[in-house]
Amino acid sequence: MLLKIDGRPVDAQCGESLLYLVRKLGLDSADLRTRPLAANVAGETFTLNYVPVREQEGKSVPRAMLRRAVRAANGEVSLLRYDSARGNRVYERTMLFVFLLAMRKLYPKTRVRINYAVGAGLYASVGDNMRLTEPEVLAVKREMRRIVEADLTLERKRVDVDDAIDFFSCDGQEDKVRLLRWRQFSYFDVYRQEDYVDYFYGEMAPSTGYANVFDLQALPTGLFLIRPSAKDPNVPAKHVYMPHLAGVFSESEEWGRLMHCTVV
């Protein structure tokens, strides 16, 4: 079936992913400035692992059909890159997954919390204000680089809400347990790699290999995960620690804790 990806026509066969079609058109790139990270289909963000044409179920003779979003878009697909707001968020989620997976492998019993985004990246607290040494931070960066080079496929899995509650409860992630108890649907979407399971609101890049530009710095009370530069996404942004601004965020979190509303 005929699709148009960034205005270029391509014949999509049943079972072929958007990533396959992007590469077929020669639109993939190692340069983060031009590399497609996800796709916009009818106003929604989709992973490039999305398969736009599949067999119609319930038919005695299988028939290929366009999926709902692609039909609504009349076969038009536009690619999201780092220079777009949605593409930027896709990259950030993917980078964050790599970071959390690395921390889980190196510190399996330690809880890591992403506290807030500020400036060029994300501030994370480790355990009970655990402070990592420079050699320990370098070890985390090496593990992140190993995960990136492994190019692990990132696929979302749908699980039963009760099963997700049981898992996160056993894993000590009580924030997610409290949120899930209010969920009105019986299912829950997670990303899984080996024994690490987590929830992210929104799509990711097709694999961990896409998050190859990052940096990690030790702070007095945690870690700072740095995104690619807006001017040149192929290098990490420069981050200057601002203790007064960090103090404002810390005070805000403390008020949230006192008011019992740390999770929204």
Regions found by a protein language model. Name each.
Residues 1-10:
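Eukaryote-biased recognition of intrinsically disordered, low-complexity regulatory segments
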Residues 8, 16, 169-170:
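Extended beta-strand solenoid/passenger and fiber regions
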Residues 17, 107, 212-213:
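Residue-level detector of alpha-helical segments with a strong bias toward transmembrane helices
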Residues 17-21, 94, 98, 139-143:
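Long, highly charged amphipathic alpha-helices
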Residues 22, 88-106:
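Active/ligand-binding-proximal structured segments within catalytic/core domains
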Residues 33-42, 48-91, 102, 111-264:
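Auxiliary tRNA-acceptor-end handling modules of aminoacyl-tRNA synthetases
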